[in-house]
Design a protein with these regions (language model features):
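Broad phosphate/nucleotide-binding scaffolds in NTP-utilizing and phosphate-metabolizing enzymes
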Residues: 1-207, 212, 220, 224-419
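Histidine-centered phosphotransfer motif of kinases
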Residues: 215
Length: 419
């Protein structure tokens, strides 16, 4: 149940902000498994563990809903941590999902059902949880993240011991760092908090806009500072953005800066699915009110968290469901913004976002082959739904769902048609 709640806390597109905030507090301190169970799992997964480890601490240093972590020392003398999956966690999660679905049928959840299709949400949650419960995927995530940030000297992730990874066991280097929100210890250790905050924000935006592969749960417990580097931990939940997503995000940012409601609405619908008809005039008016309230002439003063939660509510009210990865990014940005408020409140993530877009635009214009790419784009013409006018885009989506009827009236229909 805890893992389900944690995953749901990332879905601002599905649940009201107050629900997500409450669920985000579910940082599980679950009763750990007995070490005998842990030992047996390690033997089943890795074989003769006495040939691998000098010692394994019987006391876990972290116990969560799907796994627990123990310190250990390899035969080589290297200090590591072992992440061990809880016994029968797949079966437990499957049972929990079934119980939730049964509760939906038995209870009168009228308000919530109007907001979201709970059965579909639960299926989606289970798919996400299954990925998190496969530690081979997390090991792949760590390696991909490392490669993406290989040339950035201030970003790193724990080393993975690839020969000691299975679906149920993950062995990584032990990272002894300072929590990213422990201001006093960071200051005592000689860190510049403004510089640290700027590095964190720049890298997170890079993860999204350049790599298209970002940490989807970057709360402070999943980061620490070691030897001048920001260490990202627990990469079980990651988000992905394709080139279309990244371009639409840039378009959205430009629309916000220019206060272009029509373009912003167009982008939001382009990265969404609709579950009913849309009143475009009302939608634009409500988005305009949110912009007027949160975005002044000085965009540095924007309240990111309030702005994103308000937009999410408007979209839910208008039967619009944002792409899952976009909502993961929105949630991640809000979490990073909360961390910045604690350690370097003068840094504004929106300005970092805008500067990154300008940098990318400049690089795109002057990059090798950009003229050829531009020519190809002109020749190819309008080749995606994202380029259609907003009302036409919504109309096409309605037709695809079978929710639109087209009446055709033929003039002079009483006359016989010649073949």
């Amino acid at each position: 149940f805890i893992k389900i709640g944690q995953i749901m806390s990332n879905r601002y597109d599905l649940l009201p902000k107050e629900y997500c905030d409450a669920l985000a507090n579910l940082r599980a301190n679950v009763t750990p498994m007995d070490f005998k169970e842990v030992n047996q799992i390690l033997k089943d997964e890795l074989g003769n563990i006495n040939e691998i480890f000098q010692n394994i601490s019987q006391t876990c240093i972290g116990s969560a809903s799907i796994a627990q972590v123990h310190r250990a020392t390899l035969k080589s003398g290297e200090e590591v941590v072992i992440k061990v999956q809880r016994k029968n966690i797949y079966e437990i999660m499957s049972t929990d999902i079934k119980l939730f679905k049964r509760a939906i049928r038995l209870l009168h959840l009228n308000l919530l059902i109007k907001i979201v299709d709970l059965n579909s949400v639960l299926d989606e949650i289970y798919n996400v949880a299954k990925e998190e419960m496969n530690f081979e995927i997390e090991a792949q995530n760590l390696e991909e993240f490392r490669q993406n940030n290989y040339d950035i000297v201030y970003i790193d992730v724990p080393k993975v011991y690839k020969n000691l990874v299975t679906k149920k066991v993950l062995v990584m280097e032990y990272v002894n760092g300072i929590n990213v929100t422990d201001k006093q210890t960071l200051l005592n250790s000689g860190y510049d908090l403004e510089e640290l905050g700027l590095k964190l924000s720049n890298n997170y935006i890079k993860q999204a806009l350049d790599d298209g592969f970002f940490h989807a749960d970057p709360h402070p417990d999943n980061m620490c500072i070691r030897d001048g580097k920001i260490m990202f931990l627990d990469l079980g939940m990651m988000g992905r953005l394709n080139s279309r997503h990244k371009q639409l995000l840039k378009n959205a940012m430009n629309a916000i800066v220019k206060n272009d409601i029509t373009e912003l609405e167009h982008v939001l619908i382009s990265i969404s699915t609709t579950t009913g008809s849309i009143n475009h005039t009302k939608l634009r008016n409500e988005i305009q009110k949110v912009l007027d309230k949160n975005v002044t002439e000085d965009i540095e003063n924007i309240n990111i968290i309030e702005f994103m939660s308000s937009v999410s509510k408007i979209l839910r009210d208008h039967n619009i469901k944002l792409d899952k990865n976009i909502t993961l990014l929105m949630r991640g940005i809000c979490v990073i913004e909360g961390t910045l408020e604690l350690i370097s409140p003068n840094i504004n993530l929106i300005m970092v976002f805008e500067n990154k877009i300008k940098e990318n635009t400049f690089n795109d214009i002057f990059s090798k082959g950009s003229l050829m790419n531009t020519s190809r784009n002109i020749i190819s013409g309008v080749n995606s739904l994202s380029e259609l006018p907003t009302e036409l885009l919504s109309f096409v989506k309605d037709v695809n769902r079978g929710e639109t009827k087209i009446d055709i009236e033929m003039a002079n229909s009483d006359k016989q048609v010649d073949k």
